[in-house]
Amino acid sequence: MATELVQLSADDFEDAMDFMNLVFSASSPTNFPQLLPALYQPNDEMMGWNWAVRESGRIHAVVGSFPIEWQLGEIRIEMSGIGGVSSHLRRRGAGYMRQLMNHCVERMHDEGKHLSWLGGQRQRYAYFGYEKCGVGHTFNLSKTNLRHAYGDTTSHLSFEPLDATDLTHRAGCIELHDAQPYHCQRTAERFDFQLRSWKNRPYVALAPDGRMVGYLVANSSGDSVTE
């Protein structure tokens, strides 16, 4: 059976999303354009981050290699994030994932990427040079914590949802984000998509006079702040 490894384009958006949604929904209902709008849009640039194996023209496996520019003070780190790794159930064991992963890792070396990251099963991705690293911090804060730390002090800040059409406050969020010594470089449009990925919800913090003084990104249930 004829197979080919191809770079996807905007023309492949619907077929690729249908395929990936089908594969991932076998374990949990998944809609990639809704879940990760920062990565999946029907244009050539973003779809070109995805590579696929086709059999007789039909997609049977996909791996995404997504560019990330990480600013560390005055140093810029070029990264690639691996995601959307999927193989059709009837083609498990055919070697398509290995073929695509090897291709993406080889391209990273050719393009001079400094590092790559992914989330997934440790042993599965160890074959391609990935290993656990780094430290993540999670802070838990309750009303009781606040009462003991600040007493009955009342905050005069208010939080309003950031509307996708609110370009003024979006620009303010980007300015605050880019002022951090460590941050990712993002276009304005992709910045908004990033805030809303993983079903998260962005909010702007407003002073009593209406001035924007900050922003945060909460998860869909509103009980965790991710940014």
Regions found by a protein language model. Give the residues of each.
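Conserved beta-strand in the GNAT
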Residues: 50-52, 58-68, 79-86, 211-226
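Low-complexity, highly charged intrinsically disordered N-terminal segments
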Residues: 7-22
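Active-site rim helix/loop that mediates acceptor-substrate recognition in acyltransferases
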Residues: 24-71, 181-202
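Conserved active-site alpha-helix within GNAT-family acetyltransferase domains
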Residues: 110-114, 119-138
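Amide-forming acyltransferase catalytic core, primarily the GNAT-like/NAT-type
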Residues: 136-227
